[in-house]
Regions:
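N-terminal Rossmann NAD(P)H-binding glycine-rich loop of SDR-like oxidoreductase domains
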Residues: 18-36
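NAD(P)H-binding glycine-rich loop region in Rossmannoid oxidoreductase-like domains
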Residues: 69-110
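Conserved Rossmann-fold NAD(P)-dependent oxidoreductase catalytic core, especially the SDR/UDP-sugar
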Residues: 91, 116-164, 188
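Flexible, glycine-rich beta-alpha linker
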Residues: 139-140, 160-164, 185-208
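Conserved beta-loop-beta element that borders a ligand/cofactor-binding pocket
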Residues: 173-201, 222-228
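Primarily EF-hand calcium-binding motifs
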Residues: 350-363, 390-415
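Amphipathic regulatory helices of Ca2+-sensor modules
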Residues: 366-386, 414-428
């Protein structure tokens, strides 16, 4: 009886539609929401979303591919089929700060143009609640260094954030405010610091120097107490403090924002900073050396990353999210470092085991035949999403691997090259991408023949 009543309670929660669900934060949010009983529709612009995302969501999740926020008609169809007035929408489709600096026009089309299209689709079906991830990139040089709040952004609408990235985030907040006025909407936003993951899923954001250092830690050493030639290269001033949040704390904060009673949200525009940790590179490196005493680094400043690092606040306020959302961070710097390094060690162990499985002649090197045999045996057999595309994806995948890993072009992949590649890649995820590409090509060929594809 107890189990039945709990099931009914969980299934009664309104649906959550996530746009941009295949990113690092999106994947974790999908899994966290379904774990709390929310029915989740995960959408992204790629035609086929990762099988790992569907498995993480289970029966409460639905994956919808081929949804680009810049495509008004596709978005409208998505909302007509999967959303109503009770649906909560998350718009996570946006490039990173450094990516925006490199191509502001494209970033604006995705960030602000995408938000405008999402809000139009919401109005079309009567959806009210939208949650948006803002960023510390919205704060400029005039912002307080400590105790920064989302309220400050509201009270200083004309401050210069110092980047196109920050201007575009401000534009999204303005669009949501207009949506609230014109359609009685319930927009909410969370100002995020740098997000720290235990998985190797990050991109090229400014705060991700910390994850790069943690990833490099087991492989960097010093010589006579000085950084070796291959020491980790720190792209920002090692004494600059920046706010961060570990992904477990972040999920708690995002879900608290989504589930909060509208009447309890007292901050302007229902915006809240989600604080976590705050540390300098030097403080991080001290903690890393407790695990790897030989960790070495050299400073080689990246102009864009260092500019942002010096521009943003040192710390975010904890008062408002605790008062209205019941959120406060739990993960310390020591906890975070131990967690991330432990995850890397587990991944390294799995990598070593996979290499040993493939290295059937125990030479410490891999041939193309050995790699393809492993992929077919362990990654394809019994996986419907791979097998239905035919076996062509496997050969193309192995060709791609050999092109990347056979550095000497002698048909051999060394352990060093394979382990380095595996730090940032998953063979299963890479194979999935290749399978999706092959399936898309098959669909296109079938349409060109005048038929409707069924693969």
């Amino acid at each position: 009886e107890c189990g039945f009543s709990v099931t009914i309670f969980l299934m009664s929660k309104p649906a959550t539609l996530i746009v941009g669900a295949a990113g690092a934060v999106g994947k974790r949010l999908c899994a966290a929401l379904t774990a709390r009983g929310h029915r989740v529709i995960a959408s992204d612009r790629m035609d086929k979303l990762p099988g790992s995302l569907q498995r993480a969501m289970g029966d409460l999740g639905t994956c919808v591919g081929g949804v680009d926020v810049c495509d008004v008609e596709t978005l409208r169809t998505l909302f007509e089929e999967h959303a109503d007035e009770n649906t909560t929408v998350w718009n996570l489709a946006a490039p990173l700060s450094v990516e925006t600096a490199l191509d502001p026009a494209v970033a604006e089309a995705v960030t602000m143009g995408g938000m405008r299209n999402v809000l139009q689709a919401m109005a079309h079906v009567g959806a009210r609640r939208i949650c948006f991830t803002d960023s510390i990139g919205s704060f400029g040089a005039a912002a307080p260094r400590c105790g920064a709040t989302a309220r400050w952004l509201h009270e200083n609408p004309n401050q210069d954030p110092g980047s196109d990235y920050g201007l575009q985030k401000r534009g999204c907040r303005e669009l949501m405010a207009t949506f609230a006025e014109e359609h009685g909407g319930d927009p909410r936003f969370a100002v995020l610091p740098g997000v720290l993951h235990s998985e190797a899923v990050w991109g090229n954001g400014t705060t991700e120097y910390a994850l790069d250092a943690l990833l490099a830690a087991p492989h960097q050493q010093t010589t006579l107490g000085l950084p070796a030639q291959d020491a980790y290269l720190c792209p920002i001033d090692p004494d600059v403090r920046m706010p961060m949040v570990f992904v477990d704390d972040l999920m708690n904060g995002l879900i608290a924002l989504q589930e909060a009673d509208e009447q309890l949200l007292t901050e302007p525009e229902q915006g809240y900073c989600l604080p976590g940790l705050s540390f300098t590179p030097n403080e991080l490196f001290v903690e890393i050396r407790k695990h790897y005493p030989g960790f070495g680094f050299r400073v080689e400043l990246d102009d864009n990353m260092n500019k942002f690092a010096n521009l943003w606040p040192d710390e975010l306020s904890e008062e408002e999210p605790l008062r209205d959302l019941g959120y406060s961070p739990n993960v310390t710097l020591a906890d975070m470092v131990s967690n991330v390094l432990g995850a890397h060690e587990n991944r390294n162990m799995l990598t070593a085991n996979a290499f040993k499985e493939m290295d059937t002649d125990h030479t410490g090197e891999l041939t193309r035949v050995e790699m393809e045999k492993h992929v077919r045996k362990y990654l394809v057999r019994g996986r419907e999403e791979y097998s239905r595309t035919g076996q062509g994806a496997v050969s193309k995948f192995v060709d791609k691997l050999m092109n990347e890993l056979d550095t000497n072009k002698d048909g051999i992949v060394s352990w060093g090259t394979f382990s380095e590649w595996s730090r940032r890649h998953s063979m299963e995820e890479e194979l999935w991408r290749q399978a999706a590409t092959v399936e898309d090509q098959l669909r296109k060929q079938i349409r060109e023949l005048g038929h409707e594809p069924v693969v």
